[in-house]
C-alpha cells in the first residue's frame, strides 16, 4: 500500500521512541513556537499529536524516504516490509516510556561531625592548680590531708628545681569542706590562725632583740654583714673616703669663715657641709640597694642608689647653691670689711689637696667600671651607670673648681681691698653647685624612668634568641637597666609550631601513638586523643620558654630577669 514507507521501516529498524527523542533533541533549539502540538509527517501524510508530557520537546517534521535497490540487471525491487505500528500504538509506547521512573544513583550526604562547644561561664576554676604550701595555709589543712588527693607534676617556675607537685584547687576545696564542715567554720579557723601568726612574729621579734643584746653584752663577734662589706670596695669605698675628707674640710672651713668673715669661705664651708650630708645619703642608698628582694619588692632595691643620688642633687641645689647665692647677694648689697686671710688660704690649700685626692679615687673607680662594661669613661659618666660614684666625681670636681674660684676672688680682694670680688666668688661657687645639681637630677631621673641598655647589647641578646631553631621571630624587645649591673629583658617570641611539635614527638613512642590513632572511632575518642597530646604540646612549649630563658641568663650574667611572651 505504501511501498516507500515499508521499505524505509525495514531498512532502519529503529524504534519510534528513538525517533521521537531524536526529533525532540533537534527541536530544542528551535524554541516552543509550535505551542502544545507535535507534528509528525510520513511522506505526504501529516499527523497532529498532543503534547502528553511536559518534559518532551516539540518534535518537528520527521520524514522517512524509500530506497530503490538494484541487483544485477533487474529493475527496482521493493523489499518485504515488516508490520508498521499504528499511530495510536506509537503514541502509547511513547507515553509509557516517558511515564516510566528514571533510574537514579543513591544520594550520599557527608555529615560533618561537630564537637559541642562548652560554656565555661565568666568564672571557671575547676582546672586551677595550687601548691601544697598554699593549700595548707589558705585552707587550714595538714600534710596528711593532702596525701589522699591527686598529685600532679608540673614544670617549676624557679631555676633551682625542674618540677614540683601541685593539686587541683577543686579537690583541695572539697577536702577543706570535708575537714571543716562549712565555709563559715573555715573562715573562723583562718582568723584564729592569723591572730596566732601575728603573736608568733611579735614573740620572735622580741627574742631576736634579746639575742642581739646578749651577743653585744658578751662581746661576741658576728660575721661581717653584706651591708658592711659593700663599703670596703667599689662605690661604697669611694663614698666612705669622701665622707671622711669632706667632714674634715667642712669643719676647718667653718673655722676659717668665723675667723675671716669671707663670703667665699662661707660658700665653701656650706659646699663641704652639703657634700658631707649628700654622701651620707649615698651611703644609706648603697646599704639599702644590696638588700635581698622580698615579696613587696620582687626586683630588689637596686634603684635606691638612683633615688639617693636624686635626693642628693636636690640637696646640693637647695643647700649648696641656694645658700651660696644668698650669701653672695648679701655681700654685694652690704659689703663687710674682712680680717687677715692667711688662715683662709692655708685651709683652702689643704682642702684642694684632700678634694683632689678624693677626685682621683672616684676617677680611678669609674675608669675601672667603664672598662669592665666595655664602654668609654665619658659615656659611662654621662649615662650615670654608677650613680653613687658619679655623684662623688661631680661633687669633688665642683669642690676643686670651687676652691680655685674662692682662692682667686679672695686674692683679688686682698690685693684691691674691695670685698665685692669675694661676694662674686660666692656667686660663682653657687652657680657651679647649681650646674652640678641639675646634671645629677637629670641623669638619675632618666635612670629611674627605665633606661634602655646599649643597642649593641640588645642586638646581641636578640640574635641569640633568633638563632634558636624553635624561634621564628622576635618582636617588641625591651631591655632596661635595673642598676647595679642588672638587666631586665622582655620580648614577644613567635615560636615555630612545627619545631615545637617535633620536639614533643621525638620523646613519644610512635607504635603506641599509632595504636591510639587506630582506636579512634568516635568524635569523643578523637577529642580525648587531641586533648591528651594538645596539653603535652603546650607543656613542651612552656619548657622551650624556660630553656631559652636559662640560656639567655647563662650567656649573659648581667641579665637577671627575663620575660618571654608567646606571640
Curated annotation (Swiss-Prot):
Annotated keywords: Antiport, Endoplasmic reticulum, Ion transport, Membrane, Mitochondrion, Nucleus, Transcription, Transcription regulation, Transmembrane, Transmembrane helix, Transport, Zinc, Zinc transport
Coiled coil: none
Cellular compartments per GO CC: cytoplasm; cytoplasmic vesicle; cytoskeleton; endoplasmic reticulum; mitochondrial membrane; nucleus
Pfam families, per database record: Cation_efflux (PF01545)
Subcellular location: Mitochondrion membrane; Nucleus; Endoplasmic reticulum
Membrane topology: Multi-pass membrane protein
One of the record's GO molecular function terms: chromatin binding
Catalytic activities: Zn(2+)(in) + 2 H(+)(out) = Zn(2+)(out) + 2 H(+)(in)
Motif placement: LXXLL motif: 461-465
GO BP field: intracellular zinc ion homeostasis; positive regulation of transcription by RNA polymerase II; regulation of mitochondrion organization; zinc ion transport
Membrane spanning residue stretches: 238-258, 313-333, 341-361, 391-411, 423-443
Family: Belongs to the cation diffusion facilitator (CDF) transporter (TC 2.A.4) family. SLC30A subfamily.
Function of the protein: Acts as a zinc transporter involved in intracellular zinc homeostasis. Functions as a secondary coactivator for nuclear receptors by cooperating with p160 coactivators subtypes. Plays a role in transcriptional activation of Wnt-responsive genes. Mitochondrial proton-coupled zinc ion antiporter mediating the export of zinc from the mitochondria and involved in zinc homeostasis, zinc mobilization as well as mitochondrial morphology and health. In nucleus, functions as a secondary coactivator for nuclear receptors by cooperating with p160 coactivators subtypes. Plays a role in transcriptional activation of Wnt-responsive genes.
Subunit structure: Interacts with GRIP1, ESR1, AR and CTNNB1.
Name of this chain's protein: Proton-coupled zinc antiporter SLC30A9, mitochondrial
Origin species: Mus musculus (Mouse)
Gene for this chain: Slc30a9
